[in-house]
Design a protein with these regions (language model features):
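Active-site-proximal, glycine-rich beta->alpha crossover segments in alpha/beta enzymes
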Residues: 1-8
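Histidine-acidic metal/acid-base catalytic patches
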Residues: 8-20, 24, 34-178
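Helix-loop segments that flank and shape redox-cofactor active sites
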Residues: 31
Length: 178
């Protein structure tokens, strides 16, 4: 509770500057969405994000909506969370994960069929709520014998970006009946 109150204090203190210069704050959720080593977690569910957004009720106070972080808890309904935070999502990390056990998951390719998350439904919710911020594929697996920083494979992130752009284009065309 102390950590949450300190965050609220900080956000309230900086909101006048954010208002003056049109700066959006986008807090990243806790990753994973459960306590680790006894450390407190304050942004890990719909209830947590709504509590924070309501306590600092300013359009510049928003979220980085990370599907991997929120999605690490299978009880989180990501589509519902996107609709609940409509207008307050300033940045999106969109990646797929595959549940492998209780509180266990691994990063998967972006296609819905390769993981446990419905990537189309997530992108559609962002589209339908008028999201117009940056979207990135977040982490990437190391594929095709790539040697790079673990978690940031260039090839997989490029494939993810192309996949997400394809979904966004289809949503655009569907909305215009093209």
């Amino acid at each position: 509770e102390t950590l949450f109150e300190n965050l609220v204090y900080f956000l309230n203190a900086i909101m006048p500057v954010c208002d003056k210069y049109d700066i959006n704050m986008a807090i990243h959720p806790d990753d994973p969405a459960w306590p680790v080593f006894g450390l407190p977690r304050i942004v890990r569910s719909k209830e947590h994000i709504m509590r924070l957004l309501n306590r600092v009720d300013n359009p510049h106070n928003g979220l980085t909506f990370c599907t991997g972080s929120f999605g690490s808890n299978p009880d989180n309904d990501l589509v519902d969370m996107i609709y609940a935070a409509k207008g307050r999502i300033h940045f999106a990390h969109v990646r797929n994960i595959k549940y492998t056990g209780d509180r266990q998951f691994e990063e998967a390719a972006h296609l819905s069929s390769d993981g446990s998350l419905d990537m189309y439904a997530i992108m559609k919710a962002l589209y339908d709520t008028g999201f117009d911020g940056p979207i990135r594929p977040d982490h990437g697996r190391m594929i095709w014998d790539e040697k790079a920083m673990p978690g940031y494979g260039l090839y997989d992130r490029a494939l993810g970006a192309a996949y997400l752009n394809g979904i966004w284009e289809s949503l655009n065309k569907e909305s215009r009946n093209i």
